[in-house]
């Protein structure tokens, strides 16, 4: 098979503090990793050749911004594999250090590829088999990470990381997700949230299930944090909530966070933080425009509907997915995002943005909103006239 190199277009970023570099892997595909640190440099938009996806070229935009944090703990990976004919993209949001993220950037991809039998499992369309393979891959990587942290990490290394992974093959995408990053999709301008937040607080069904699971494992929730400590309930690493739970309890007593009497009543029946992912299959029908993966440094400061609308507006203006990605990160910074921000946008290349009528995607929504408003006003007038 002739290996095609993606076309690289460079655009200079004058505001965002980030760094990224591409490199070719042994299979002739493309690998993208951001570098750590607070830098100003060029960013790269990748037009993956159609042979990688079997449909139309995917145009990738990405940025990873340190923002106002003292350290950069996020990471992103994009791999377009010409041999195995699928694309892989991942956003990692680290915490308590970056060592877990650095381990995951290579190991998770390799484990996923192995579990998917170098992509051949994707050909069969057996979602149950694909789901099982990806779950095993995540859990295997977590076990290896915990061993690595114990063998090579500092004794005080309590780092961990969320992960939101997207695999695209032909006209279908698979999302594997743990943590509080998020993936959303634009379908003719209508937003679809593809993932749930794995957080031990909130009133959503996912949050309630996470709280229940943590408590059944013997944990407890204080102010939306497991054991008063961590605000995500699924993540890689976080060794103190897995293989070193008893050490965590002892440390808490030594630091005066809880008493020995309290600890004596604790009986762990499982891990409070787990790396078992949610797996979703997403058909990429002709009306799917783009998919966004991003860390919570974006979503905590912008509604997903606003994010999709903003990206569409940007693409209508100039059609450049990389500039749209960088501009989106800047908006989050302008809204005082205090976290690292990492964003990947996969424009599926199906939309002629310059020919797309402005606000076309909002017509139905606006009509519904207008009808609702008129209805509420009418009811209000009726009630006022009859109650007065």
UniProtKB/Swiss-Prot annotation:
Keywords: Chloroplast, Hydrolase, Magnesium, Manganese, Membrane, Metal-binding, Plastid, Protein phosphatase, Transmembrane, Transmembrane helix
Residues of the PPM-type phosphatase domain: 59-348
Protein name per its UniProtKB record: Protein phosphatase 2C 57
Enzyme Commission (EC) number: 3.1.3.16
Pfam families (UniProt xref): PP2C
PANTHER family found in the cross-reference section: [PYRUVATE DEHYDROGENASE [ACETYL-TRANSFERRING]]-PHOSPHATASE 2, MITOCHONDRIAL, PROTEIN PHOSPHATASE 2C
Transmembrane regions: 363-383
UniProt source species: Arabidopsis thaliana
Cofactor(s) named in the record: Mg(2+); Mn(2+)
An example Gene Ontology CC term for this record: membrane
